[in-house]
Amino acid sequence: MKLIAVLLLVVLATATTATAADADALQDLCVADYASVILVNGFACKPASNVTAEDFFSNLLVKQGATNNTFGSLVTGANVQRIPGLNTLGVSMARIDYAPGGLNPPHTHPRATEMVFVLEGQLDVGFITTTNQLIAKTIAKGETFVFPKGLVHFQKNNGWEPATVIAGFNSQLPGTVNIPLTLFNATPPVPDNVLTKAFQIGTKEVQKIKSKFAPKK
């Protein structure tokens, strides 16, 4: 009985560890087959005979992103949806460009920890813990900062020049929950009475905020 109990504990511990990040690959590669209708916590593998170097290559992060938008920033993702060779490998990247004063608004990555490296500029960055503690710092060219998995975080260009970072994730598809857009531009919309109660503001204020995120006609 003791041996069985120990074995059960080992199995449970292993299962818990396995779910802490993307599952380990069980083969050398599993290039995503975008044409397959089968989706089991990832993409199906395309035949090994059809795999080429292009499946593992991308120039997505070469060009600066257009930052002439509401927040003054643009995230260019290099994840499994853009690079099929990342399937099952548990990593991805992104380039984030910021106009002067630009903001990557408060958001979370439900499936990954993020680490950023500043290519150009200076940024105010931070994350908020589950006890509502703000952990923040100003980072400059050549410096790095880590945002723990699932915690709300942000980056803001505090300078007069454009800024750029490269971000790394321990997931092939980290996912992004943009807090302002999630709450005020969801489809179907979050009920006004939920937002008025949550933010202790009136319906007119909620409608005004929603109008700022509505698609431009």
From Swiss-Prot:
Subcellular localization(s) per the UniProt record: Secreted, Extracellular space, Apoplast; Secreted, Cell wall
CDD domains recorded: cupin_OxOx
Domain Cupin type-1: 58-207
Annotated family: Belongs to the germin family.
Keywords: Apoplast, Cell wall, Disulfide bond, Glycoprotein, Manganese, Metal-binding, Receptor, Secreted, Signal
Matches recorded under Gene3D superfamilies: Jelly Rolls (2.60.120.10)
Protein name: Rhicadhesin receptor
Disulphide bridges: C30-C45
Role, per record: Putative receptor for bacterial rhicadhesin, an attachment protein of rhizobiaceae.
Binding site for Mn(2+): H107, H109, E114, H153
Protein modification: Glycosylated.
Gene Ontology CC annotation, any one: apoplast
Originating gene: GER1
